[in-house]
């Protein structure tokens, strides 16, 4: 069974020539929305995502505007409002060393450099300069860990284990 990943959400149409307005969920919109690439539309009703080929991409304000082959006017794309744009796992590109997809990080166990278990990563936030990992602790409130070299010492995706240095005031 194919594992699918969201890269955007179709929130509206734009104009009358079949453009759709997308709120992007990818860090690589220029690469992901390149003309000729295939994305998959998954509608709100469920079912298997179906392929669409990108014929144009441009940015407008905070949105990405896309058109698809075979969908040349607003009436043809109106049905896609609220749908998700997805890619199969085999279309995920290789990342540089020290970079990870969210789905690789979420679910990893977090330990201190002394070996004390802190919890499991349940969410990744992107508030600004660096990502923040939300750690679900066995007891008490969630813990927020900044993804910076001074704190995150080692990430082992294969073993789903992250080792951190606890800076003063972090816990």
UniProtKB/Swiss-Prot annotation:
It comes from the Bacteria. InterPro entries: PRC-brl_dom, PRC_barrel-like_sf, RimM, RimM_N, RimM_N_sf, Transl_B-barrel_sf. Keywords: Chaperone, Cytoplasm, Ribosome biogenesis, rRNA processing. GO terms for cellular component: cytoplasm; ribosome. It is found in: Cytoplasm. GO terms for biological process: ribosomal small subunit biogenesis; rRNA processing. Residues 97-170 form the PRC barrel domain. GO terms for molecular function: ribosome binding. Belongs to the RimM family. The PRC barrel domain binds ribosomal protein uS19. An accessory protein needed during the final step in the assembly of 30S ribosomal subunit, possibly for assembly of the head region. Essential for efficient processing of 16S rRNA. May be needed both before and after RbfA during the maturation of 16S rRNA. It has affinity for free ribosomal 30S subunits but not for 70S ribosomes. Binds ribosomal protein uS19. This is Ribosome maturation factor RimM.
